[in-house]
């Protein structure tokens, strides 16, 4: 590392360590050298401080959609006291009203299409979404949004028509064949996915008609759709509480969890390898929590730089 960069990084690390209220630079020790000695002693094969900071910066930008998505899922599905809770996984919740400014989990919801929402757990088996026949004059849609925040498919009047139909939603690890009766298969890149239904409200007196359409929306595991025995349930997950303040310091702990359910695509292999090198995600050789204080301070600095880019 160039001497001037070393001095600058040392000063930044000391500032970051002091900011989180921990000792580290009061004896004028070189935090970069201290980290190298600590990692060697602990046999942790972590990159150098400067590289760790760069990985954290890139990883923050890459991982932010996953963490924001987890925050919405936590409020809608996992925390019954969130004030935004809708329903457990693989259950549909119908809103018999339009969204207002008080509905804060999603930044910009529509105000003229009452929502029906379902968060899908696709780990054990695919899920079938069934829609009724809808008057062609009435707009409706089902937007499929995965943990990467990719919109990977639409069902509805403009995309698939207004006729009744059954649609298969599959996770990234599913290898089965399309069963009879399925109109189309949609592939999520993550194990968990949001299905957001929108049904047009024509005027204030139209809500009973909207509710009748909503009553026709169904979600079933594939085994139930086929009248077959269900496969073994997916393992329970120890979901961490989502807290916007904690995210500021524990962002990569949340990302480490989220990456378990988001297999890397070919275009993600490079950043995933970098994250694994600092103890985050599949393929890691040590736990993120085992990093030295100096490396964690470098990660905080990298996060701040990444935040400036988004």
Regions found by a protein language model. Name each.
Residues 2-12:
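Bacterial N-terminal signal peptides that target proteins for export
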Residues 14-19:
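Core hydrophobic alpha-helical transmembrane segments of single-pass membrane proteins
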Residues 20-24:
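C-terminal motif of bacterial Sec signal peptides marking the signal peptidase cleavage site
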Residues 27-310:
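A compositional/structural signature for long, glycine/proline-rich flexible linkers
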């Amino acid at each position: 590392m160039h001497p001037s960069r070393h001095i600058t990084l040392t000063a930044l690390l000391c500032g970051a360590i002091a900011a989180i209220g921990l000792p580290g630079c009061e004896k004028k020790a070189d935090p970069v050298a201290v980290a190298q000695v600590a990692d060697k002693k602990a046999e942790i094969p972590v990159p150098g401080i400067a590289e760790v900071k760069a990985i954290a910066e890139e990883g923050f930008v890459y991982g932010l959609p996953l963490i924001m998505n987890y925050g919405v899922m936590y409020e809608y599905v996992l925390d019954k006291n969130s004030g935004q809770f809708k329903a457990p996984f693989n259950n549909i919740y119908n809103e018999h009203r339009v969204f207002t400014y008080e509905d804060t989990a999603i930044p910009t919801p529509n105000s003229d299409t009452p929502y029906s929402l379902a968060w899908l757990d696709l780990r054990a088996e695919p899920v079938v979404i069934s829609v009724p026949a809808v008057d062609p004059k009435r707009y409706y849609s089902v937007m499929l949004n995965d943990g990467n925040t990719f919109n990977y498919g639409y069902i509805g009047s403009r995309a698939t028509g207004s006729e009744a139909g059954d649609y298969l939603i599959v996770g990234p690890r599913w290898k089965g064949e399309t069963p009879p009766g399925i109109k189309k298969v949609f592939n999520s890149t993550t194990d968990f996915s949001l299905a957001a239904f929108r049904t047009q409200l024509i005027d204030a007196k139209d809500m009973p008609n909207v509710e009748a359409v909503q009553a026709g929306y169904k979600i079933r595991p594939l085994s139930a759709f086929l009248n077959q025995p269900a496969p073994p349930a997916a393992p329970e997950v120890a979901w961490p509480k989502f807290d916007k303040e904690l995210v500021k310091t524990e962002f990569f702990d949340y990302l480490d969890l989220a990456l378990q359910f988001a297999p890397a695509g070919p275009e993600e292999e490079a950043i995933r390898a970098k994250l694994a090198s600092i103890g985050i995600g599949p393929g890691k050789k040590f736990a993120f929590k085992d990093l030295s204080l100096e490396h964690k301070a470098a990660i905080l600095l990298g996060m701040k730089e990444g935040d400036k880019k988004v």
